[in-house]
A protein has these predicted regions:
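Glycine-rich, acidic/polar active-site loops that bind/position phosphate-bearing ligands
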Residues: 1-177
């Protein structure tokens, strides 16, 4: 029997912008069901969610999906809320404010990102010297002259869909990268 790796993912307490955090629990057997994911703890003093003298915070799993990219089929992504040691929602846990019984509102988000060329430290496709062309031709563009990194974008989309994440679509933005 192979082991399963559950990657617990949560938002830290940094302001004004929270960042993703993660740690991996290894288990002998896992059904893939949320009710079989254990609550876990972490040191909140390193994530701006607790003080050093009282640093325990809890990770409450709220969603689990297969991780199609890692661990040969035995990987799972576990989305978590952060709780205080007494089980109440942590102040950084904005999701706790959502009323689960309220299905009258919908939201969506657009995940924008810029790919950086590690050799130049500039957005992918930017010239090494000078400035890029004006932004007009890049938005929703196709073709090698105006689009860079499409293979990575396509792979990202594929992995999200394989994991069961709802993605509405992709498009190039107003600049290279």
């Amino acid at each position: 029997m192979s082991k399963h790796k559950l990657e617990y993912i949560w938002l830290d307490g940094y302001k004004p912008s929270q960042s993703l955090r993660g740690k991996t629990m290894v288990v002998e057997d896992f059904s893939g069901k949320l009710e079989d994911v254990k609550q876990w703890s972490f040191d909140g003093s390193s994530t701006e969610q607790a003080t050093g003298d009282d640093s325990d915070c809890l990770l409450q799993p709220v969603h689990v999906i297969p991780d199609p990219d890692r661990f040969g089929g035995n990987g799972w992504l576990v989305m978590c809320e952060v709780l205080n040691p007494d089980g109440t929602p942590h102040e950084s846990n904005g999701r706790a404010l959502i009323d689960d019984d309220d299905d009258d509102f919908w939201f969506g988000f657009e995940q924008e990102y810029t790919l950086i060329d590690t050799e130049t430290n500039l957005p992918l496709g930017f010239p090494k010297n000078g400035y890029p062309d004006p932004q007009g031709p890049f938005y929703t563009s196709v073709g090698a002259r105006v689009t860079k990194g499409r293979d990575l974008v396509d792979e990202h989309l594929h992995l999200c869909l394989e994991a069961g994440l709802n993605v509405e679509g992709i498009n190039a933005e107003v600049m290279m990268g």
